[in-house]
Amino acid sequence: METILSSCLYDPNLKTKFYIPRFTHRLLIAHAWGITPGQKILDIGCGQGESCLVLAHLVGRTGHITGIDIAQPEYGSPYTVKESHDYVRKSELGSRITFLRSDTPSFLRDLHRPAREVFDSVALFHSLWYFPNSQSVYDLFRTLAVDAQAPRVYLCEYSYEISLEEQNVHALAAQTQRLFYRYRRPRAPGDLEQNVRAGLDQASILEAARGAGYRVVRDGKVTPDPSFLEGHFEVQYVEGEKFMRRVKEEALTEAQESEILASLARLREVHEEWKRAGHETVRNLDIWWAVLELGA
């Protein structure tokens, strides 16, 4: 853990509350996938590189991680994507990681050879909820299967199927963001994009993967420890002024705005009930993970 933390740019005041639970969760998922030394992995939607650090730690000196993302260099807070990547490059794990700003089709085209000759697997580490719509997820799996011929895909994402009643608050926050993103005008991602965009559920993601020719060889679910606060932060965002301002500035139809505000009102109602019961933080949704392989 210390090797990973020392390779990450973060606020030391948030080490215990935020970063240790975050990396502990990512290590748990990567171990469930079965990441082993020597692997060459393409990490799609790598963001600021936290997933790359975990994967680089597990693949060792003989492995390598290539992280790609379309995010603007200025995206991210309190540290931007550019600041985070620059820090990682100079760290102990930096030699095992390559960062590139690119979409998947462009990256694969620029390889000038089949991706299967360069990478033995692809990772989608909490990145699919960031995709703008369901078609983009279907297109991704088709690209991975046909163009890249990627033999193995590791994926994980939040599950809307709650196992604990107290996870309902996070689910409502995610669904409210997804609803807004469905109605907003299509445009290129900006510096302040929300985390939940298309927010596809497990069945839709697996339908896209299977339609492209992938099969599930191993899967499971993880209920995060209460110290894992991603869901809590999502609720804070949706209930905050920034989200409301974005809804108002989008010039939606009256019906669309009313639907979003009704979803937000339901979120606040359930969250207030949760707080009256004596709880200060929100329980995170379960995470489902899978290992997919191409072919029969």
From Swiss-Prot:
Its EC number is 2.1.1.-. Pathway: Mycotoxin biosynthesis. It comes from the Eukaryota. Residues 37-142 are annotated as: Methyltransferase domain. InterPro entries: Methyltranfer_dom (IPR025714), SAM-dependent_MTases_sf (IPR029063). Keywords: Methyltransferase, S-adenosyl-L-methionine, Transferase. It holds the Pfam family Methyltransf_31. This is Methyltransferase ustM. It comes from Aspergillus flavus (strain ATCC 200026 / FGSC A1120 / IAM 13836 / NRRL 3357 / JCM 12722 / SRRC 167). The gene is ustM.
